[in-house]
Design a protein with these regions (language model features):
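Short loop/turn positions at the edges of beta-strands in beta-sheet-rich folds
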Residues: 30-32, 42, 74, 91, ...
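HotDog/MaoC-like acyl-thioester-processing domains
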Residues: 2-3, 89-92, 96, 102-139
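Hot-dog-fold acyl-thioester-processing enzymes
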Residues: 16, 41-63
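A generic structural signal for short beta-strands and their flanking turns/coil linkers
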Residues: 22-24, 34-36, 76-82, 93, ...
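Hydrophobic beta-strand-centered segment that forms part of the acyl-chain substrate-binding groove
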Residues: 67-96, 101
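Short, aliphatic-rich beta-strand segments
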Residues: 34-41, 99
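Hydrophobic residues in beta-strands and at strand termini
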Residues: 40-42, 86, 135
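Non-catalytic linker/capping segments at the edges of enzyme domains
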Residues: 1-37
Length: 139
């Protein structure tokens, strides 16, 4: 994914204002029109009782990546609906969410995301998701 420095800097600035994203350790890795990659390191306090990444954080990563991907095309958005498919236990040293805009519109944007667990043996797809976002005119 090619980085566009101004776009990447803008998204990182927005990300810095989101307290939840900062608490999780979410970073914007790369951005271009319609595509964003974010990452979050594993910490034990992000896990559920079996030691896997909590499904709530899986959803948060997918929602966040999709939202940022939509922002690169239409500006300010708010999530209307999202769905998550957990494919396997999310175990890794780092989690990478890659989102893309599927269909932009004047009032809504459809996005899709894949979430990978990264560890010493590479990346494994752990979840997929889709988000429907509403365009926030004038913001």
């Amino acid at each position: 994914m090619n980085n566009h420095p101004n776009l990447l800097a803008q998204l990182r600035a927005v990300n810095q204002t989101a307290a939840f994203n900062q608490w999780c350790g979410i970073d914007i890795v790369s951005a271009e029109a319609g595509k964003v990659e974010i990452a979050m390191p594993w910490r034990p306090d992000l896990g559920q009782y079996s030691g896997f990444l909590h499904a709530g954080l899986i959803g948060a990563l997918i929602d966040t990546a999709c939202g940022f991907a939509a922002v690169t095309v239409v500006g300010s958005v708010i999530a209307s609906h999202y769905s998550v498919n957990c494919l396997r236990p999310a175990v890794g040293e780092r989690f990478i969410a890659r989102a893309r805009v599927v269909k932009p519109g004047k009032s809504q944007v459809f996005t899709a995301c894949e979430l990978f667990a990264q560890s010493g043996d590479g990346e494994k797809l752990v979840a997929t998701g889709e988000t429907l976002l509403l365009v926030q005119p004038g913001k």
